């Protein structure tokens, strides 16, 4: 039996804005009581603000038991992992990740319009979406092991951990629930 309820709320901004939005939302008594027993996931990328490590500390120390689902450096890092393994020893700068997206999508510019387009994720996943998602999850696990072996931890070392994604845990859980419910 599964009881997953997803209620996405868009904070429209960087990690600090996501945190502030969640804190303000949960300060309201009606929201605090309604979501008391819910898992509260904060989904963000780590390219902004510059003090991302301090923001992560605030999130962890808030008392609202947030689960942090991040993509470092960009959300596109996670998307690229669906069609290519990323390695920490290589160039994983914003410029490189955006170029990989541009090349894969066969566009001359990777604009906000393309980024927000409903078809973009479909183009990345193609007809074998489940395989690509599972491959991205495995890539994320390899990166996680790499950083663990180096003694790095998101709570204190996120700025040194590029690329790294933790959102895979939420995605994997959702996929497993779908498989469980659908057989």
Model features per residue range: what roles?
Residues 2-9, 23, 28-183:
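C-terminal accessory helical subdomains adjacent to catalytic cores in phosphodiester-
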Residues 15-19:
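Eukaryotic endosomal/vacuolar membrane-trafficking regulators centered on PX-domain-mediated PI3P pathways
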């Amino acid at each position: 039996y599964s009881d997953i309820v997803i209620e996405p709320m868009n904070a429209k901004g960087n990690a600090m804005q996501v945190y502030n939005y969640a804190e303000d939302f949960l300060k309201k008594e009606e929201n605090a009581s309604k979501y008391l027993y819910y898992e509260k996931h904060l989904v963000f990328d780590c390219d902004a603000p510059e003090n991302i490590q301090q923001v992560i500390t605030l999130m962890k120390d808030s008392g609202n038991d947030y689960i942090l689902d991040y993509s470092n450096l960009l959300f596109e890092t996670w998307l690229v992992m669906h069609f290519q393994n990323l390695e920490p020893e290589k160039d994983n700068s914003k410029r490189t990740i955006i170029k990989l997206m541009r090349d894969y999508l066969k566009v001359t510019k990777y604009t906000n319009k393309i980024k927000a387009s409903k078809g973009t994720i479909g183009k990345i996943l193609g007809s074998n979406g489940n395989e690509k998602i599972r491959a991205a999850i495995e890539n994320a696990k390899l990166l996680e092991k790499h950083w663990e072996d180096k003694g790095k931890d998101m709570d204190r070392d996120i700025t040194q951990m590029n690329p790294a994604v933790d959102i895979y845990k939420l995605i994997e859980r959702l996929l497993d629930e779908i498989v469980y419910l659908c057989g």
